[in-house]
Amino acid sequence: MIFQRTVQKMVKSTGVGLHSGNKVTLCIMPAPVNTGIVLKRTDLSPAVSIPAKADMVRETTMCTALVNDAGIRISTIEHLFAALAGLGIDNAIIEVDAPEIPIMDGSASPFVFLLQSAGIKEQAAAKKYLKIIKPVRVEDGDKWAELKPFKGFRVDFRIDFDHPEIARSQQHMVMDFSTSAFVKDISRARTFGFMRDIEYLRANNLALGGSMENAVVLDEYRVLNPDGLRYEDEFVKHKILDAFGDLYVAGHAIVGEFSAYKTGHALNNQLVRALLAQQDAWELVSFDKEADVPVSFMVPGALAHV
């Protein structure tokens, strides 16, 4: 049987909130089987827990935010969720003492490191996969996103930015998911933004924690970061990273192909909601043998060496 996973022990880290600019402490803890991913605001009294479900994503402007019925929010979850998805973590309690997850370096890599430091433990329950059996597609103008049947998890993603630096880079990527491919080729890709937008956001008390320490910043012509890019195609890779995180609020690893053109947090979430609403388009499956699993998650003991 292929088992569910959680972390072996609690792990904690501190970073900066992208929008507030304030210090944020994050704590990732083990959780029992079938818990899923639950986020908890410990700065509130009493503390408030929000399950990571598609219908709890109620804001997608510049990030993905979970918001409960009382309006309590936890923002910027997507990079952490990409790491959870990439390492195949099914169950975890994530405590945070602020209304946002720390931005860290703008990628998923610090969260991958945290999860590897905590260790990954298999649990005595079958891991469930969300298998796509009929295509589901959402559109917004010329932007679109689609999930369709595929034996594995494949991503086919295209961006289209009218900027000389991005135009010079590869704006289309196809990848077959595996933990090692995610960690090596995707997880280090940072969020990116334009100087003109950052100035506007700061004038409106947003992105106060944003800097070249946690984002690729571009002016009208070039990348301003002194060290340049981590990957030649870092822009499209970061959009794929975001999509991994956004899709994980479906609650399970997906078996299927995700194709997208110019999509972002809003359309990604619309796709997950449309999928879950169309109950004949998917089924939950589990596997008895490693050889039968179409999505390759590295065994826990090997993760530390990726």
From Swiss-Prot:
Pfam families: LpxC
GO biological process: lipid A biosynthetic process
Pathway(s) the chain acts in: Glycolipid biosynthesis; lipid IV(A) biosynthesis; lipid IV(A) from (3R)-3-hydroxytetradecanoyl-[acyl-carrier-protein] and UDP-N-acetyl-alpha-D-glucosamine: step 2/6
Name assigned to this protein: UDP-3-O-acyl-N-acetylglucosamine deacetylase
Species of the source: Shewanella frigidimarina (strain NCIMB 400)
PANTHER family: UDP-3-O-ACYL-N-ACETYLGLUCOSAMINE DEACETYLASE 1, MITOCHONDRIAL-RELATED
InterPro entries in the record: Ribosomal_Su5_D2-typ_SF, UDP-acyl_GlcNac_deAcase, UDP-acyl_GlcNac_deAcase_C, UDP-acyl_N-AcGlcN_deAcase_N
Family: Belongs to the LpxC family.
Function per UniProt: Catalyzes the hydrolysis of UDP-3-O-myristoyl-N-acetylglucosamine to form UDP-3-O-myristoylglucosamine and acetate, the committed step in lipid A biosynthesis.
Entry's Gene Ontology cellular component terms: membrane
Taxonomic superkingdom: Bacteria
Entry binding sites for Zn(2+): H79, H238, D242
Cofactors required: Zn(2+)
Reactions catalysed according to its record: a UDP-3-O-[(3R)-3-hydroxyacyl]-N-acetyl-alpha-D-glucosamine + H2O = a UDP-3-O-[(3R)-3-hydroxyacyl]-alpha-D-glucosamine + acetate
EC number: 3.5.1.108
Any GO MF annotation of the entry: UDP-3-O-acyl-N-acetylglucosamine deacetylase activity
Gene it is expressed from: lpxC
This protein's UniProt keywords: Hydrolase, Lipid A biosynthesis, Lipid biosynthesis, Lipid metabolism, Metal-binding, Zinc
Positions annotated as active site in the UniProt record: H265 (proton donor)
Metal-binding as UniProt keyword: yes
